[in-house]
Design a protein with these regions (language model features):
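A short, small-residue-rich loop immediately preceding and capping a beta-strand
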Residues: 121, 129-168, 261-275, 295-296
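General beta-strand structural signal in soluble alpha/beta enzymes
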Residues: 104-108, 138-139, 188-190, 231-235, ...
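Active-site-proximal loop->helix
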Residues: 146-209, 306-318
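Phosphate/pyrophosphate-binding loops at sites that engage ATP/ADP/AMP, CoA/4′-phosphopantetheine
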Residues: 253-260
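A glycine-rich, Thr/Ser-enriched phosphate-binding loop motif common to dinucleotide/cofactor-binding enzymes
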Residues: 113-124, 235-250
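Positively charged, low-complexity intrinsically disordered leader regions
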Residues: 2-134
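Short coil/turn connectors at secondary-structure junctions
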Residues: 100-102, 133-135, 157-161, 182-185, ...
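Active-site/ligand-binding loops adjacent to catalytic centers
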Residues: 71, 85, 201-239, 247, ...
């Protein structure tokens, strides 16, 4: 009996019916207004360009200041089919190893069908793409998690999925590539010969190892040049953070179940969707004075934009197809 009680407190599992019915948008609770995307001083309008290649539902969510955005019922069903709600585990052995009096918990986003949190927004974006009558979606991927997630989600909606994968990682991870292809994704090493951006780079350097910025440019160009395709992005933007809030909303319910309140929340941070999805529902309550909690982001030393980047307007891709976005940047 005692062992069962300990297990119940160490594996905090929500029922499928406890899945949150709405996503959370932290913009509703932040003081002031964030700097808006803007066009550069010369050249064509990037803001107008994005309106042609991004999904309409996602663009609406991108600028929304509504606190709660209902999760469409079919997306809720897809979340449940993909294993949501995800468990929260207590790390007792790590506590003993560290000799700490702290209680340590970790959220199991790794239990998704593709192994990461990326599925949370991929399922939503693929659903919206199907609702808007798209034939397919295009995107980029770095480590490969986002490309895999979108290929999986697109397959559930009967959509084609074109993925431009940073060449150095494409060559490094053939098994991950095979998984994308298993879900029906068509994967190109980036820079590729499928786009003018890629061809231009390869003409100058046939052995170019690629970058995420180049892959973003290729994904955007593919959606622009191929009717019926929309471009999907797996991190960075507001609508992605909204979809990922499902992580933090579940986590908040799970801590309520065991009458605990986290005082420190730690997450890895690349583009920010994992960290943001995890902490923003809690951060919104901190802003409103309803809770006390510290938030720590752990970032790779190879891309330390938060600690070494400059906070300024910059493009989000190599070919300067995106609007100028206010960010901590090491350059595009």
């Amino acid at each position: 009996m005692q062992e069962a009680l300990v297990k119940a407190r160490d594996q905090i599992i929500l029922n499928p019916d406890d899945l949150p019915g709405s996503w959370y948008n932290v913009l509703a609770d932040l003081p002031g207004e964030f700097p808006r995307p803007k066009d550069p001083e010369d050249g064509p309008s990037r803001l107008e360009y994005l309106s042609r290649v991004l999904l309409k539902h996602c663009l609406q969510q991108e600028v929304s200041t509504e606190r709660w955005i209902p999760i469409p019922s079919p997306v809720q069903d897809l979340y449940r089919q993909a294993g949501r709600p995800r468990p929260l585990y207590r790390a007792r052995r790590l506590e003993r190893f560290l000799g700490t009096p702290a209680k340590l918990y970790y959220k199991r986003e790794d239990l998704s069908p593709t192994g990461s949190h990326k599925v949370n927004t991929a399922l939503a974006q693929a659903y919206y793409a199907a609702e808007e009558g798209c034939a397919g979606v295009s995107t980029e991927t770095g480590a490969g998690q986002w490309g895999t997630a979108l290929a999986y989600a697109a397959s559930l909606q009967g959509l084609k999925c074109i993925i431009f994968w940073v060449r150095s990682v494409y060559d490094w991870k053939p098994d991950r590539r095979a998984l994308m292809q298993l879900y029906g994704g068509k994967v190109f090493a980036s820079p590729s010969r499928e786009t003018s951006v890629g061809r231009g780079i390869l003409e100058k350097n046939p052995d170019h190892v690629g970058s995420l910025g180049i892959a973003v440019s290729e994904g955007l160009e593919y959606a622009e040049k191929n009717p019926g395709y929309a471009y999907c992005l797996g991190s960075v933007l507001n609508h992605v953070l909204i979809h990922q809030s499902i992580i933090g909303l579940e986590t908040m319910k799970q801590f309520d179940m065991i009458d605990e309140k986290p005082d420190v929340m730690i997450g890895c941070l690349g583009g920010g969707s994992n960290f943001g999805g995890f902490i923003l529902p809690f951060a919104g309550e901190v802003v409103k004075g309803k809770r006390e909690c510290r938030f720590l982001a752990a970032q790779s030393a190879s891309a330390p934009n938060l600690s070494k980047g400059e906070y300024k307007y910059d493009f989000g891709d190599h070919a300067e197809k995106t609007p100028l976005l206010k960010m901590y940047t090491l350059g595009h």
